[in-house]
UniProtKB/Swiss-Prot annotation:
One of its GO terms (molecular function) is ATP binding. It comes from the Bacteria. Coiled coil: none annotated. CDD domains: F1-ATPase_gamma. This is ATP synthase gamma chain. It comes from Arthrobacter sp. (strain FB24). Belongs to the ATPase gamma chain family. Signal peptide: none annotated.
Length: 297
């Protein structure tokens, strides 16, 4: 009986230590998510402005630019999957990877080859474990993205988009990430970057009119200059949304883990007390039995 009590004491001690870790991680995620949400909000004006500019240039020009023209046949598609570097965030990365798998299956059903690019160690480990190839990987700052990484990703994707199919190039580019809606709602999302599609949320309302531009230099040169920046801003915006979603998911996961730890501590405390009461009862019974035996003799 005493050994059982010691086991419960050890479980209470270890669970209490784990609860402290969960609480610390919850507080860290809570403190960082405010900054992450602010970065998401700060990125929107630039993303909206450059989207309108590119939309205006594309809609008012009649040039056959590869970045805005739908190809006759799409044979290979690039899929950029944005996950996290670290775990302890519930089903955050698993949900994104499930969405990416669904997109990959859909593209293959349409007869397209898929070339995968990954952001985050979780996606890297997922594909490595299954011995599935990926073109490039970026890791190290998924919960605090930097624009330089978005520029590097954008340059790699644009280079492959400009490369011929026979040389390993792609005909369209998709991004799979988690859109941050609120602290309790984050949604795995797929967007197509190229050929150019204006995202509905960033498009101008029907009452707004696109500005009329007089292009200097030529329209094609304007698109050549604008579109790389447009792609970089869209990728960076997706990374910021994913970072806020990751922190929100981690905060919820750590709070849930802490609550579960509290429940376990209560359970082990109750079992320990029950075992202690049983031990005391047994000792009293033995004392009474011994006293009765002495009296009988």
């Amino acid at each position: 009986m005493g050994a059982q009590i010691r086991v419960y004491r050890q479980k209470i001690s270890s669970t209490t230590s784990m609860r402290k870790i969960f609480k610390a991680m919850e507080l860290i995620a809570t403190s960082r998510i405010g900054k992450a949400r602010a970065r998401v909000a700060a990125s929107l004006p630039y993303a909206n402005a450059i989207t309108r500019a590119v939309s205006a240039v594309a809609s008012q020009s009649e040039i056959d630019h590869p970045l805005v023209t739908e190809p006759e046949q799409i044979r290979r598609a690039a899929v950029l999957v944005i996950t996290s570097d670290r775990g302890l965030a519930g089903s955050y990365s698993a949900s994104v990877l499930k969405q990416a798998e669904g997109l990959t299956e859909l593209l293959r059903e349409e007869g397209k080859e898929v070339k995968t690019y990954v952001v985050g160690r979780k996606a890297q480990a997922y594909f490595d474990f299954r011995n599935r190839p990926y073109a490039q990987v970026w890791t190290g700052n998924t919960d605090s993205p930097v624009f330089a990484t978005a520029q590097e990703i954008g340059a790699a994707l644009l280079e492959d988009f400009a490369t011929a199919y026979e040389e390993g190039g792609v005909d369209e580019i998709h991004v799979v990430y988690t859109r941050f809606k609120s602290m309790v709602t984050q949604e795995p999302t797929v967007i197509r970057l190229l050929p150019l599609e204006v995202v509905e949320e960033q498009a101008a309302s029907e009452s707004d009119l696109l500005p009329l531009y007089e292009f200097e230099p030529e329209t094609e040169q304007v698109l050549d200059a604008l579109l790389p920046r447009y792609i970089e801003s869209r990728i960076f915006a997706a990374m910021l949304q994913a970072a806020a979603s990751e922190l929100a998911a981690r905060q919820r996961a750590m709070k849930s883990a802490g609550d579960n730890a509290t429940d376990l501590i209560k359970k082990y405390t109750r079992l320990r007390n029950t075992a202690r009461q049983a031990e005391i009862t047994q000792e009293l019974s033995e004392i009474v039995a011994g006293a009765d035996a002495l009296n009988a003799s």
